[in-house]
From Swiss-Prot:
Keyword annotations of the record: Cell membrane, Disulfide bond, G-protein coupled receptor, Membrane, Olfaction, Receptor, Sensory transduction, Transducer, Transmembrane, Transmembrane helix
Annotated signal sequence range: none
The organism's taxonomic lineage, starting at the top: Eukaryota, Metazoa, Chordata, Craniata, Vertebrata
Record topological domains on the Cytoplasmic side: 55-62, 130-148, 227-246, 305-324
Gene3D superfamilies assigned to the protein according to its UniProt record, in alphabetical order: Rhodopsin 7-helix transmembrane proteins
Protein name: Olfactory receptor 52N5
Family named by the database record: Belongs to the G-protein coupled receptor 1 family.
Length: 324
């Protein structure tokens, strides 16, 4: 460690650790095994729910609509990739104390975590636009959201999430790490890694804020605008039944937005502004729940709130093979 500290005085020397140590949840190391139990249970529920939903939407012709395409073939698959990138590694830390992660593997995990969450945010935005077209322009729905348009929207969302995250590993690689290689976290997250650097991280912070604006803030603004127009259109409906139907078609999506963005914004602001007021253990727990809780609850929320999915699930378990 003294050698690392002395090297910081020489800006021409670039120090890159061969690996990082993911220390888990700081202050709660003795109860890691107990913390892992609900996380593992949620992960199993998450796998069953999302894989089952992907299969159901593929299998059931009555669910071959844009809304379910976004949810089943996009949101569920992205959730599967995101959680599988982080949770098995966290369970290895909790159960077997396998805390070491290669430097490049850490950068890869960081890229995938941020990239997939960026894509997920875009999918939620597209789902809001889908609801806007369905409620405000119901007669044009089938001609507006055609398969080519859906494919282009999904591709644009994916490319935005991936391309904006590509600089993160390179911004981290340029930094010298001469203090410690111990990360108080269960996975490699951009701010957790760069805080270990002994050089200025101003560029990393600025770029991170820019990405947050281009993805999180932009998507929230689009979602808010969509639901403002939806609310305006629903209120103008003359029939109370029509208004009720319009609102009921949005409740599942609104629930998904809340359980996704609330922990996401907590994690974002805690990293940057809550270092002295928010306990590190709380921050790490919420960061894990942010990646695991929404994907676990989404199939349940959509199954409860969406009549077509409920009917398809019942139909599937009754063994009815006919197309819906």
């Amino acid at each position: 460690m003294p050698l690392f500290n002395s090297l910081c005085w020489f800006p021409t020397i670039h120090v890159t650790p061969p690996s990082f140590i993911l220390n888990g949840i700081p202050g709660l190391e003795r109860v890691h095994v107990w913390i892992s139990l609900p996380l593992c249970t949620m992960y199993i529920i998450f796998l069953v729910g999302n894989l089952g939903l992907v299969y159901l939407i593929y299998y059931e012709e009555s669910l071959h609509h844009p809304m379910y395409f976004f949810f089943g073939h996009a949101l569920s698959l992205i959730d599967l990739l995101t959680c599988t990138t982080t949770l098995p590694n966290a369970l290895c830390i909790f159960w077997f104390s396998l805390k070491e992660i290669n430097f490049n593997a850490c950068l890869a995990q960081m890229f995938f975590v941020h990239g997939f969450t960026g894509v997920e945010s875009g999918v939620l935005m597209l789902m809001a636009l889908d609801r806007y077209v369905a409620i405000c322009y119901p007669l044009r729905y089938a001609t507006t959201l055609t398969n080519p348009i859906i494919a282009k929207a999904e591709l644009a969302t994916f490319l935005r999430g991936v391309l904006l995250m590509i600089p993160f590993p390179f911004l981290v690689k340029r930094l010298p790490f001469c203090q410690s290689n111990i990360i108080s976290h269960t996975y490699c997250d951009h701010m957790s890694v760069v805080k270990l650097s002994c050089a200025s991280i101003k560029v990393n912070v600025i770029y991170g804020l820019m990405v947050a604006l281009l993805i999180g803030v932009f998507d929230i603004c689009c979602i808010s605008l969509s639901y403002t127009l939806i609310l305006k259109a629903a209120i103008s409906l003359s029939s109370s039944d029509a208004r009720q139907k319009a609102f009921s078609t949005c409740t599942a999506h609104i629930s998904a937005i809340i359980i996704t963005y609330v922990p996401a914004f907590f994690t974002f602001f805690a990293h940057r502004f809550g270092g002295h007021t928010i306990p590190p253990s709380l921050h790490i727990i919420v960061a894990n729940l942010y990646l695991l809780l929404p994907p676990t609850l989404n199939p349940i929320v959509y199954g409860v709130k969406t009549k077509q999915i409920r009917k398809s699930v019942i139909k599937f378990f009754q063994g009815d093979k006919g197309a819906g």
